[in-house]
């Protein structure tokens, strides 16, 4: 990494580790006077890697410079902003700063981890200031689908940066305060915002006249029109506003609210502690579902992205012991599809359709409302804040490019697309000179059970290969002179039926023996000199010969090669 930190010690630098060029994985770094600040540490979701649903950002840069980091600041509780903390914090051990609701949620979420007692989670009052030298931070309330979403105003002697987090302007939120436009306007009038770093996820939606209260009205109508069977609503688990909306809609239809999914229980517990839940709303435990008829229940379940460990997936696959889905039941997807999850979600749709249930989503009904701004709201934000520099983040390339174009149309002097790994120098004297000055290579990590694997790991590559083409195993027993003792042991998993396909086990054995013996002849050839002067070199050569032969056979017969596991065992 060719970055001289001393050279830029007095400069404001911005470095996104995740979320710029993709949806999710939000993790952004800010630098001034030799110190660094982390804003958010989220996960991303994937269906591309067998056995892996979640990926976390590459934090090698943080670890290499850990002595210069002052802490982690959290904007809000959504998984794409906090989900990586549980996997990465133990490597960093930095203090975490967040508002009361976010702090309580983090403590509850992380309580089951061994390092929970070590964690320092510090509560910050919203609309108040926090000093983490050399930074002075101000948490500014913005509306989102969860309460206490805070934009972070990062103040330095060289200029101030407004990191927006996820936001929208909503006049009648179901929960939480409205956006603090008064403070935003004040900042704009005073010319106090040098740069604004803002999300881009909803940039293509031009406008929206509806709010969560309007959604509540329509959900009441939808629920009342499906009277006979069970109603299951699946949402993003951390969307506490939607939990309240659905609970109120269920109550108006005379239904009790059931919950399936640990993460939902967690958010409800914290919301209850904060007195966010409306009076008269009671939640039915899973073990008590049998006490009610289906038409008396509305169940809120995890699984809106097709996750195979979720409550809805278990329902769809008859793995939920307390209640079953049947014809006449209704499933409502009160959520949007995160790019990349289409395959998993459509697979879930198909599984549910096998049960003849009715599926309702935002394509056929008004059952979801985004927590993100529309383009008109972004334009309003720029009129309020009037930044001299805009860095578009949190979105795929098309979102960032469109955000940059809109910001430019709004008269922002310098607009930049964020890109993971880019180190951007924010120039306070000449904002138009703000630019990328360097780049670090990043490799996200897959959350594989209890361990983290770099996405470029050979293990990930092998797993993909096995998933695509299966595995073909060959065990060869030899004596100390490498003479084969017995027929090779062969096993084919996920690619070939050795009993019924045209290439029989015996044929494979013959081909392997031929390749092996031909390899021995080449090894014994005097012309090869000292190329095979030790057993390791001999074994490596023989393995390559067998691999080459098997690869040719499979390519001719199947059109593709499986993952080969070939072992030579000396007896």
Where are these regions (language model features)?
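Hard-cation-handling environments
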Residues: 204-334, 338-363, 367-532, 543
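Conserved hydrophobic residues forming the short capping helix/wall of the S-adenosyl-L-methionine
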Residues: 110, 407, 554
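His/Asp/Glu-rich metal-coordinating catalytic cores
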Residues: 2-73, 78-291, 310-324, 343-345
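C-terminal tails and terminal domains of large nucleic-acid-associated
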Residues: 535, 539-571
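Flexible, glycine/charged-enriched surface loops at secondary-structure junctions
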Residues: 195, 260-261, 362, 393, ...
């Amino acid at each position: 990494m060719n970055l001289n930190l001393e050279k830029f010690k007095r400069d404001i630098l911005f470095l996104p580790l995740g979320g710029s060029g993709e949806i999710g994985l939000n993790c952004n770094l800010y630098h001034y006077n030799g110190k660094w600040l982390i804003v958010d540490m989220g996960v991303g979701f994937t269906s591309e890697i067998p056995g892996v649903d979640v990926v976390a950002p590459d934090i090698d840069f943080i670890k290499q410079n850990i002595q210069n980091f002052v802490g982690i600041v959290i904007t809000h509780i959504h998984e794409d902003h906090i989900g990586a903390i549980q996997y990465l914090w133990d490597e960093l051990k930095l203090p975490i700063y967040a508002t009361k609701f976010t702090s309580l949620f983090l403590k509850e979420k992380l309580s089951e981890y061994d390092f929970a007692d070590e964690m320092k989670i510090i509560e910050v009052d919203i609309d108040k200031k926090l000093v983490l030298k050399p930074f002075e931070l101000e948490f500014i309330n913005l509306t989102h689908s969860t309460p206490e979403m805070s934009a972070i105003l990062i103040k330095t002697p060289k200029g101030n940066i407004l990191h927006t987090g996820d936001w929208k302007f909503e006049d009648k939120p179901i929960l939480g305060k409205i956006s603090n436009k008064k403070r935003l306007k004040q900042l704009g009038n005073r010319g106090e915002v040098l740069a604004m770093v803002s999300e881009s996820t909803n940039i293509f939606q031009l406008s929206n006249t509806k709010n969560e209260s309007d959604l509540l009205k329509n959900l009441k109508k939808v629920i009342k029109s499906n009277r006979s069977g069970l109603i299951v609503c699946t949402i993003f688990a951390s969307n506490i506003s939607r939990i309240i909306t659905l609970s109120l809609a269920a109550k108006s239809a005379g239904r009790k609210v059931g919950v399936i999914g640990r993460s939902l229980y967690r958010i409800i517990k914290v919301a209850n502690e904060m007195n966010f839940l409306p009076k008269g709303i009671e939640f039915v435990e899973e073990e008590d579902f049998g006490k009610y008829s289906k038409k008396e229940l509305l169940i809120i379940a995890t699984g809106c992205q097709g996750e195979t460990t979720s409550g809805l997936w278990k329902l769809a696959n008859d793995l939920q012991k307390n209640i079953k889905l049947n014809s006449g039941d209704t499933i409502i997807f009160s959520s949007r599809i995160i790019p990349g999850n289409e395959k998993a979600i459509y697979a879930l749709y198909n599984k549910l359709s096998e049960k003849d249930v009715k599926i309702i989503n935002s394509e056929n009904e008004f059952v979801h409302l985004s927590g993100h701004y529309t383009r008109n709201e972004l334009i309003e934000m720029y009129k309020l804040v009037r930044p001299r520099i805009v860095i578009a983040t949190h979105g795929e390339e098309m979102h960032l490019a469109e955000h940059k174009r809109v910001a430019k149309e709004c008269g922002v002097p310098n607009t930049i697309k964020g890109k993971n790994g880019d180190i951007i120098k924010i120039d306070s004297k000449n904002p138009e000179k703000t630019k990328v000055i360097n780049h670090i290579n990043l490799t996200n990590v897959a959350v594989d059970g209890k361990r983290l694997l770099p996405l470029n790991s050979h293990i990930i590559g092998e797993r993909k290969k096995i998933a695509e083409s299966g595995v073909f195993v060959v065990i060869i027993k030899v004596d100390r002179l490498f003479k084969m003792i017995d027929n090779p042991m062969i096993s084919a998993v996920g690619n070939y039926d050795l009993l019924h396909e045209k290439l029989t086990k015996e044929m494979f054995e013959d081909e392997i023996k031929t390749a092996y013996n031909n390899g021995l002849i080449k090894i014994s050839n005097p012309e090869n000199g000292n190329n095979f002067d030790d057993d390791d070199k001999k074994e490596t050569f023989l393995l390559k010969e067998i691999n080459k032969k098997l690869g040719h056979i499979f390519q001719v017969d199947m059109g593709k090669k499986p993952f080969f596991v070939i072992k030579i065992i000396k007896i």
